[in-house]
């Protein structure tokens, strides 16, 4: 029987750990650092920080961990995979060189240009005045991006030149390189794929909701909810995404000498002229993972082991239901949040920034939990989730009431 270590402590890692626990080959799932909400599902949490690579390697060796799965982007960008590989331990995730596809927007844009992968035109700037001058000459809307990792909050779609100038000034406070990108109109979606060398397993499509408030108002967040599959993303669109983006990305990594075992997450947009890449992430999305992995009907542990050994995995996904999840966050999110706010306990939820005990959880950060449901249609799945939330004592926690609404423009219950 196998022991699995999941690195991270959020709702995504809770879902990954539950999927690993469902494997008949797995005896124990550890999560470092995890959170108290995970303990409710029999996951063993560890007092080891996700950036303490030496501590994680020592634990993996001492507890005969056969597979480590990395959830968040920050340890990947810092080289956790290289560290584990140097210690001879099996780990699923991109090495530090490949992780630049997410950790540097400039690296990603150059990669897409080199390998003819469709994406918006852009210019990069290293000093404020030239960026402001260029922005002023361009039409709006325009997209301002920080080069490095920004927890999903490093992008501004500016609808006026004044807003663009303010975003550029803010961006240069945290980054030495800023990108100004042409705005592309279309329908956004997430397409993730588990990759091992030239082999891959495609996940169902998903759409997350980045803005804090209903009708896509308010500030950007890490994500306030998601649903899957996305009705507007037809089999023909998926085929186009595979042919023009996913397979060229996998081939491009190989051509550039970047060995790859991990997740490629395409933040895609369906435009009038086809699918384009908005951004790459090299890890599973949060909150999408929480409504994607429950759709897997195969052994998740075996899928990952096969990919690590560069074998084609058997990954079967359900095709008859829609899965939908709503994130609940502490008051103040995505700004400074109130700690110690009571968080309801409910079976099946995925917990994130919580403290306390498994039976008495309290907020310890921004997003605290995600409530999910599945049903034969998107409308029914949405209804089921909000009925669950209505029965919880959510108190001062904040959440959106319209998750899934975008998908309904193409569906009827």
From Swiss-Prot:
Sequence ranges assigned to domain ATP-grasp in this UniProt record: 109-309
PROSITE patterns per the UniProt record, alphabetical: ATP_GRASP, GARS
Cofactor note (record): Binds 1 Mg(2+) or Mn(2+) ion per subunit.
Biological process, per Gene Ontology: 'de novo' IMP biosynthetic process; purine nucleobase biosynthetic process
EC numbers, comma separated: 6.3.4.13
Residues reported to bind Mg(2+): 279, 281
Cofactor(s) the protein needs: Mg(2+); Mn(2+)
Molecular function per GO: ATP binding; metal ion binding; phosphoribosylamine-glycine ligase activity
Catalytic activity: 5-phospho-beta-D-ribosylamine + glycine + ATP = N(1)-(5-phospho-beta-D-ribosyl)glycinamide + ADP + phosphate + H(+)
Listed InterPro entries: ATP-grasp, ATP_grasp_subdomain_1, PreATP-grasp_dom_sf, PRibGlycinamid_synth_ATP-grasp, PRibGlycinamide_synth, PRibGlycinamide_synth_C-dom, PRibGlycinamide_synth_C_sf, PRibGlycinamide_synth_CS
Enzyme class: ligase
Residues that coordinate or bind ATP: 135-190
Keywords: ATP-binding, Ligase, Magnesium, Manganese, Metal-binding, Nucleotide-binding, Purine biosynthesis
Annotated metabolic or biological route of this protein: Purine metabolism; IMP biosynthesis via de novo pathway; N(1)-(5-phospho-D-ribosyl)glycinamide from 5-phospho-alpha-D-ribose 1-diphosphate: step 2/2
Family: Belongs to the GARS family.
NCBIfam families: purD
Protein known as: Phosphoribosylamine--glycine ligase
Protein's organism: Lactiplantibacillus plantarum (strain ATCC BAA-793 / NCIMB 8826 / WCFS1)
Gene: purD
């Amino acid at each position: 029987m196998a022991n699995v270590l999941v690195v991270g402590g959020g709702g995504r890692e809770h879902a990954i750990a539950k999927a690993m626990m469902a494997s008949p080959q797995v005896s124990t799932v550890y999560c470092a650092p995890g959170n108290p909400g995970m303990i409710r599902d029999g996951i063993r949490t560890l007092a080891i920080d996700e950036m303490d690579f030496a501590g994680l390697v020592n634990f993996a060796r001492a507890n005969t961990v056969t597979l480590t799965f990395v959830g968040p982007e920050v340890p990947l960008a810092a080289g956790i995979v290289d560290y584990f590989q140097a210690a001879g331990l099996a780990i699923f995730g991109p090495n530090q060189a490949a992780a630049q596809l997410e950790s540097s927007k400039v690296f990603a844009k150059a990669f897409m240009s080199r390998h003819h992968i469709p994406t918006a035109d852009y210019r990069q700037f290293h000093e404020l005045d030239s960026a402001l001058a260029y922005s002023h000459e361009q039409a709006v809307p325009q997209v301002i991006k920080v080069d490095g990792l920004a927890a999903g909050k490093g992008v501004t779609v500016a609808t006026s030149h004044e807003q663009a100038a303010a975003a550029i000034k803010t961006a240069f406070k945290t980054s030495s390189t800023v990108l100004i990108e042409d705005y592309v109109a279309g329908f956004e979606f997430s397409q993730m794929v588990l990759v091992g060398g030239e082999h891959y397993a495609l996940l169902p499509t998903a759409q997350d909701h980045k803005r804090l408030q209903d009708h896509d108002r308010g500030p950007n967040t890490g994500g306030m909810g998601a649903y899957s599959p996305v009705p507007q993303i037809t089999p023909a669109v998926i085929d186009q995404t595979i042919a023009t983006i996913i397979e060229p990305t996998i081939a491009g990594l190989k051509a550039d000498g970047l060995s790859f075992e991990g997740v490629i997450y395409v933040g895609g947009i369906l435009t009038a002229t086809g699918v384009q890449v908005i951004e790459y992430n090299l890890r599973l999305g949060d909150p999408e993972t929480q409504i994607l992995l429950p759709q897997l009907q195969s052994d998740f542990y075996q899928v990952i082991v096969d990919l690590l050994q560069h074998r084609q995995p058997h990954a079967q996904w359900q095709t008859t239901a829609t899965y939908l999840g709503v994130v609940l966050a502490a008051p103040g999110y995505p700004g400074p949040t109130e700690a110690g706010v009571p968080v309801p306990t409910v079976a099946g939820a995925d917990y994130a920034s919580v403290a306390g005990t498994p039976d008495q959880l309290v907020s310890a950060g921004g997003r605290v939990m995600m409530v999910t449901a599945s049903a034969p249609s998107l409308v029914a799945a949405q209804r089921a989730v909000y009925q669950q939330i209505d029965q919880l004592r959510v108190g001062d926690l904040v959440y959106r009431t319209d998750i899934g609404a975008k998908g309904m423009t193409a569906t009827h219950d």
